[in-house]
UniProtKB/Swiss-Prot annotation:
Protein's name in the database: NAD-dependent malic enzyme
Species of origin: Vibrio cholerae serotype O1 (strain ATCC 39315 / El Tor Inaba N16961)
Gene label: maeA
InterPro entries per the UniProt record, alphabetical: Aminoacid_DH-like_N_sf, Malic_enzyme_CS, Malic_N_dom, Malic_N_dom_sf, Malic_NAD-bd, Malic_OxRdtase, NAD(P)-bd_dom_sf, NAD_malic_enz_proteobac
Site (Important for activity): D267
Cofactors (names): Mg(2+); Mn(2+)
Parts forming coiled coils: none
GO cellular component: cytosol
Superkingdom of the source species: Bacteria
Amino acid sequence: MNNDKRPLYISYAGPALLSTPLLNKGSAFSAEERASFNLEGLLPEATETIQEQVVRAYQQYRGFESDMDKHIYLRNIQDTNETLFYRLVQNHISEMMPIIYTPTVGAACENFSNIYRRGRGLFISYANRDRIDDLLNNAANHNVKVIVVTDGERILGLGDQGIGGMGIPIGKLSLYTACGGISPAYTLPVVLDVGTNNPQRLADPMYMGWRHPRITGPDYDNFVEEFMQAVQRRWPDALIQFEDFAQKNAMPLLERYKNRVCCFNDDIQGTAAVTVGSLLAACKAAGSQLSQQRITFLGAGSAGCGIAEAIIAQMVSEGISDEQARSQVYMVDRWGLLEEGMPNLLDFQQRLVQKKANTQHWTTENNGYSLHDVIRNAKPTVLVGVSGAPGLFSEEIIKEMHQHCPRPIVFPLSNPTSRVEALPSDIIRWTNGEALVATGSPFDPVLHEGKTYPIVQCNNSYIFPGIGLGVLAANARRVTDEMLMESSRALASCSPLAINGHGPLLPPLESIHSVSKKIAFAVAKKAIEQGVAPEVTDEALEASIEQHFWQPVYRRYKRTAF
């Protein structure tokens, strides 16, 4: 945690100090600091507090009309004065999270080269594959503890954005700090530029990435391996989060590295953890267990299958067999229900096929079973959308589900907002207010027949900042499935609906710091229990979490020659 009474000794001075975002205070430099660091005359006369700076910055922010302009403005503050940026965001977290991350970050990625102002993080091009160690040594932050890396191929639901995908690691790490208290000095966003197959990007004269079709196969795998080895040489204890890799690479990369380095995939494991946590809270509020639910997924990619496997693991922990748990989970993709004997299924999909014996008495008018067929025959109590295809949870689908389930749980999780499977307002209306709805992107509360229904954002930001904080606080060497499961349970324990029987399914973002600390403690405890972190007392662990929790306050500076 920051201690603003303890001075920080730095050698930067003059314009160089004002140009260093991690150290710049702008108008908050004291008269003594201005004299000591050659800043006199470089700043207006008034010395301000950080709260006075926040008031001005917020006034300027409110002056922008479009979300994109607001995003650009906040990114400019981040690249000028990081402490001010995080104080501003923390003061207005609910309002600004959709601007710095989903859904606005999607448009920012699509327009990355057009709105580019200043470099942040590392752009590691395939053309420089023989110099990755040198590139890592060029990073602005030297004591890196958390890396978010993407290759830009599957950015949200927007597909291949090339280096435009850098907006995602930048946004994710902003939330590691704003929500999880991880110092921005410890973070590094990385994009692996292996080209792009997006014809719009390649044809755009403004595009700033490597103009080449995507590298694939062994060349791609070797490039990622070189990067991972270089990171291990430079920062052997860093946590690496894989972000927005295409389905064909996401799961294989996770399987290849999860037992070698401290890493996880947020799209697969983070999404699974927050979804399981939300479902556990919903079940607790209803007086039931997850193992009693029948769950249908629309979308059987790596994210959907990752959520399904996490749900099955939780069901088994509640006392049912793995076989029984799998029989209660129905995966539907564009070709229909995944069934045994279907051709061309990926390895991670094979474990989630439904046995013919479970569907032999079902009725259908088609070859195979559509989503509507599954809803009608399986009678699910939970419907999860991770398809990236808008509007597929139709009125017919939702009403069919509601016929056999008085309080359906419906999670249209696809991002950004334009890709959501159904609008929350429609789901509430079609079920006469009886559905419990959570979404992947933010939506306003729904007013239906005089009653207001809060729409919870089932967002990974409830989970990954706490995981990162727990890994750092415990000095964990790996991120295990059991650690992720504990994060889900910790999140569920924070649910106002589960605790009080009313209120939102997940806690408000204004309490995200306490949520992240609770998740961090649960994750760290499990890491110690599993032997992937040094053994310490609970008291020492809590102290470590507080010590690692960075706050956006200005420290006093003292001049050093070195």
